[in-house]
Amino acid sequence: MRHGNGLRKLNRTSSHRLAMFRNMAVSLITHEAIKTTLPKAKELRRVIEPLITLGKEPTLANKRLAFARLRDRDAVVKLFAEIGPRFANRNGGYTRVLKMGFRQGDNAPMAYMELVDRPEVDASEADGAAE
């Protein structure tokens, strides 16, 4: 039975939670890695994994579903043009959550969430971007 296996409320109203996860999903699609608290990262997996699965099949209906959930045109374009084809041969497990200690102010457990097959950044490219 699935009694009590609901989602984490994270001390927010349902509309705030929806907006927060929508913003976090757009950030993860755009930057391919984000830093957040561990409970938010674990809950974000439930939002982002089905979106990436939608992105693997670029039909008009899937694009409309993704836009209804994300409300960000650039993120939807990147989802279907880059991220979906990248994970074409992977059946789920598109994200990785790495624990990274505790936040200074309130000791909240922090996590680094990233897409699994994220392209590596060379040291020379990173130096060029920093300058």
UniProtKB/Swiss-Prot annotation:
InterPro entries: Ribosomal_bL17, Ribosomal_bL17_CS, Ribosomal_bL17_sf. One of its GO terms (cellular component) is cytosolic large ribosomal subunit. The keyword Ribonucleoprotein applies. Disulfide bonds: none annotated. Pfam families: Ribosomal_L17 (PF01196). GO terms for biological process: translation. Keywords: Ribonucleoprotein, Ribosomal protein. PANTHER family: LARGE RIBOSOMAL SUBUNIT PROTEIN BL17M, RIBOSOMAL PROTEIN L17. Part of the 50S ribosomal subunit. Contacts protein L32. HAMAP family: Ribosomal_bL17. This is Large ribosomal subunit protein bL17.
